[in-house]
Amino acid sequence: MKLSASFAALALLLPFVQAQSPVWGQCGGIGWTGPTTCTAGNVCQEYSAYYSQCIPASQATSVTSVSTAPNPPPTSHTSTSSAPSGASTSTAKLNTLAKAKGKLYFGTATDNGELSDTAYTAILDDNTMFGQITPANSMKWDATEPQQGQFTFSGGDQIANLAKSNGMLLRGHNCVWYNQLPSWVSNGKFTAAQLTSIIQNHCSTLVTHYKGQVYAWDVVNEPFNDDGSWRTDVFYNTLGTSYVQIALEAARAADPDAKLYINEYNIEYAGAKATSLLNLVKTLKAASVPLDGIGFQSHFIVGQVPTGLQSQLTTFAAQGVEVAITELDIRMTLPSTPALLAQQKTDYSNVIKACASVEACVGVTVWDWTDKYSWVPNTFSGQGAACPWDQNFVRKPAYDGIAIGFGN
C-alpha cells in the first residue's frame, strides 16, 4: 500500500514565518530567519543552538531537550570534572525492583570497549541489577555493513553473547538512522528501487543474524526534526516517507517474533515532533504496517524533566503499541553539587514513576550506568554526571531515586 500521500501532510509541519510564532512554532536557532517572539501566553524555549520553539509559559521550566549526536567511542572520564558525588543508601537491585513492579526489565546500554574493564563488568553482569542490554554502537550501519554487501557482526556478537550468558534481554540498535552511516550509503546516488533493495538487504541481514536473540529492534531511529518535519537524509530524499514502511516490513519478515520500534527523542512532552510521530504511528497502524513499540530516548537535564512524560507514554500506548524508556540519562552542568545531585535523584524517580504508572511501558534503559563511560561530556561541553553511578562505580543518590520510582 502506498503511504506517501498520507505521510506528505506530516512533512508540511514547517516553521511559521510571521510577526510572532504561535505555540509549537519555531522561534530561533542557527540559520533561522523567522520570528523570534511568541504569541501571548507562550515563551521561546531554547532546545539547542539550532532550534528554539514556542511553548506554553506554564511548561517553560519543565521541558527539556537534547539533540542526540553520534555516540563517540567510550572514554574514561576522570573524577576531576565533578565534585564527590555522595552515595546511595539503597541496597535494592534495580532489575529485581522493575520486575516486581510488573516491568520486563531495567537495563543499560554498553559498548565493546568497556567490556575489558573488569570492575565495570562485575556490576554489568549482575542480572538482578540489569535485565536488558543495548549495544550503543556495534549494531549500527557503519559497524555492520561498512562496505556494500560486506557484513561484520563481531562487535554486536560480543554484546549479544554477553546478554545470553547473563540471561538478559537484548535490544537491537538500530537498523535505519540518518547518522553513523558508511559513506557508500550517505553519499550514494541511488534510484528509489536501488535504495529500497539496499534497506531491505541491510535490515533483513542484520535482523536475521540475531533472530531469536533480540527482544526488540529500534528499526527506525530519529526520523523527525524537532519542528515536526521529516529529516532530509538519503532515505527521505530518495524514498520519501515510505522508507519507514520498507524497513519495518523487512525487519518483520526477518524475525517475526522481535518487537519492532521507532526510537525518538524530544517526544517526552507535547509538541510538533511528538504530534508528527503520533500521526505516523496512526498511519502505519491503519495500513497494517508492522510496528510494535515507540522508544522514548529521554536524554534529560537536571531540573527539566517533562512533567507530562506519563501522559505522553499513555497517549502513544493508546495507539496499540508498547512504549519504553530507551536511553535515559539526566545531565548537569559540572561540577556537581549536593543540590544538583538531590534534584537528579528526584528527576530519576519521576521518570521511573512515569513508566511504572503506565502498563504498556515495558521497561527502562539507562544510556550506560556509570559516568565513567557516559557519552555526555564528549558531546555537551561542561556537562556530565548524568548516570546513576559515578565514575568510580559508586552509586549516587540517583540510584535511590530509581529505587523509589519503582516503589522501594
From Swiss-Prot:
Cysteines engaged in disulfide bonds, as pairs: 355-361
pH dependence comment: Optimum pH is 4.5.
Top-level EC class: hydrolase
GO molecular function, one term: cellulose binding
Pfam families (alphabetical): CBM_1, Glyco_hydro_10
Pathway(s) per entry: Glycan degradation; xylan degradation
Biased composition annotated in UniProt, kind: Low complexity: 76-89
Domain CBM1 residue range list: 20-55
Gene Ontology biological process: xylan catabolic process
Protein name per its UniProtKB record: Endo-1,4-beta-xylanase A
Organism listed in the record: Phanerodontia chrysosporium
Gene: xynA
